[in-house]
Amino acid sequence: MLLIRNADVFAPRALGVRNLLLGGGKILWLGPARELLDLPAALRADSQIIDLDGARLIPGLIDGHVHVTGGGGEAGFATRIPPQLLSRFTTCGVTTVIGLLGTDDVARGPRELLATVYALREQGLNAWSYTGGYHVPPVTLTGSVHSDLVFIEAFLGIGEVAISDHRSSQPTCDELLRLAGAAHVAGLMTGKAGVLHLHLGDGQRGLELIRRAIADSEIPARVFNPTHVNRRRALFEEALELARAGSTVDLTAFPVKRGEDAYTAAEALQRYFASGAPAERITVSSDAGGCLACFDSDGHLASMEVGSAGALLQTLRELQAGGMSLEQALPPFTSNPARLLRLSDKGMIAVGADADLVALDADGAAQTVIIRGEVHVRDRTVVRRGTFET
């Protein structure tokens, strides 16, 4: 068991200074700091105590868009990004990842993706994934996305299917609807999220295909989950309307250059809240391990950076520096993705919830990281490393 004392808890709601008891991967007890649980002597002897001395304690971050196998490959095999190692996430306060395939869903496929998800789980990280990739028809493990979702526990939805992008397979509205229908029905059958996670490129068509799919079908708007919606300012304005219509939209925490026609995740989140759009229908992800690419007018790769899970905590710091409270800023990184993905025991600090916790230092960095009750980072030092980390 693990007793955490004197934690300034944001659940995401601010609860004040509390003590917590963790055991069996769960939060067993949560009480005021002045209260100490009267444990039997045998349990006291086996319990570890961490005194946070008033440090802020938040739910572990849920990163809903991660290239766990590595992304890239748009300029030859040498540009394929290596797989992401465990501490790349834990040191950044990320306790849950959702893996996916991007442009390269040929050299990399669902078998490798699923194996990487299982490997991360064995190393202590919470991990799930989407089936499919950028292209239509999608790559699958069982022969169809529908049966992938029904029979493979780790698959939560379909994605990331590319639209409004020169790298996409230029799917039609009917093709998009068939995928959305498969995701929706599989979600009904299994209780999974059953969402269609859609990569948005820089194309001027923007969210037109999603709007048409919603208007022309009976499929609920919540099934359609577009990401990268802050990459163009006009696209972001479209995303506000889509959120009002019932979709959850996802911001990407990527770097934005001065004068670029884009919003940082912090800027976009501030604008989103100011717009009055539903606060529960916005999430932020990192695109960790993905290729943050720039292309020339001929569609050739001009430059690339690699997405980092550290962008999530950096965005949280920027939001607070801009005057937003931690209580308001946290849900898009915690409870909102948990709700979208139907991970009912995650994204919150409450009795019975999974013990996925991050203590922040004064600078907003991850001081202590706990996943299902196991300490991975303590005093900013990695204490649990991945299999091939030194």
Describe the role of every protein-language-model region.
Residues 181-293, 301-302:
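Active-site core of metal-dependent hydrolases
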Residues 71-72, 76-80, 84-100, 148-169, ...:
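Active-site gating loops and adjacent loop-to-helix segments of metal-dependent hydrolytic enzymes
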Residues 42-47, 52-115:
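Metal-associated gating/positioning segment near the N- to mid-region
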Residues 7, 20, 25, 54, ...:
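Divalent metal-coordination and catalytic microenvironments
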Residues 1-2, 9-58, 382:
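Histidine-rich, glycine-flanked metal-binding segment
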Residues 7, 24, 349-390:
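C-terminal cap of metal-dependent C-N hydrolases
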Residues 84-137, 152-166, 188-202, 222-227:
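Divalent metal-dependent hydrolysis catalytic cores, especially in the metallo-beta-lactamase
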Residues 274-359:
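His/Asp/Glu-enriched, well-ordered alpha-helical/loop segment
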